[in-house]
Amino acid sequence: MRDRADEEGLQEKLRLIRLLHQINPYPHGQGTASQRRNRRRRRRRQWFRLVALATKLHTIPDPPTDSPLDRAIQQLQGLTIQELPDPPTDLPESNSNQGLAET
């Protein structure tokens, strides 16, 4: 079981490295020597930033599958509103309304 988890972790890292290589290709060989050097430096800095980001993302632990928040959300989703009776169609007249109409 442990070997399988290690293998899956290795495959995930390889996929991540492949993705990073696709995102940040090696610079072209055209231009003066200083232009090529600057492009290589920029690429190296970008590469280190991407690797740092990838390691941060890879080391973030997964949230627990059954946290109290998840249980509370499931309970709230299970709630339903009860059907209310229809309101009355004709309203009874009150004495205060009649007094205002006569004056």
UniProtKB/Swiss-Prot annotation:
Residues 80-103 are annotated as: Disordered. Gene3D superfamilies: 6.10.140.630. One of its GO terms (cellular component) is host cell nucleolus. Its main location: host cell. One of its GO terms (biological process) is mRNA transport. It is found in: Host nucleus, Host nucleolus; Host cytoplasm. Pfam families: REV. Residues 92-103 have a biased composition (Polar residues). A motif (Nuclear export signal and binding to XPO1) lies at residues 71-82. A motif (Nuclear localization signal and RNA-binding (RRE)) lies at residues 35-49. Residues 16-24 are annotated as: Homomultimerization. GO terms for molecular function: DNA-binding transcription factor activity; RNA binding. Keywords: AIDS, Host cytoplasm, Host nucleus, mRNA transport, RNA-binding, Transport. InterPro entries: REV_protein. The RNA-binding motif binds to the RRE, a stem-and-loop structure present in incompletely spliced viral pre-mRNAs. This region also contains the NLS which mediates nuclear localization. These overlapping functions prevent Rev bound to RRE from undesirable return to the nucleus. When Rev binds the RRE, the NLS becomes masked while the NES remains accessible. Homomultimer; when bound to the RRE. Multimeric assembly is essential for activity. This isolate is from a Gambian case of 'neuro-AIDS'. Escorts unspliced or incompletely spliced viral pre-mRNAs (late transcripts) out of the nucleus of infected cells. These pre-mRNAs carry a recognition sequence called Rev responsive element (RRE) located in the env gene, that is not present in fully spliced viral mRNAs (early transcripts). This function is essential since most viral proteins are translated from unspliced or partially spliced pre-mRNAs which cannot exit the nucleus by the pathway used by fully processed cellular mRNAs. This is Protein Rev.
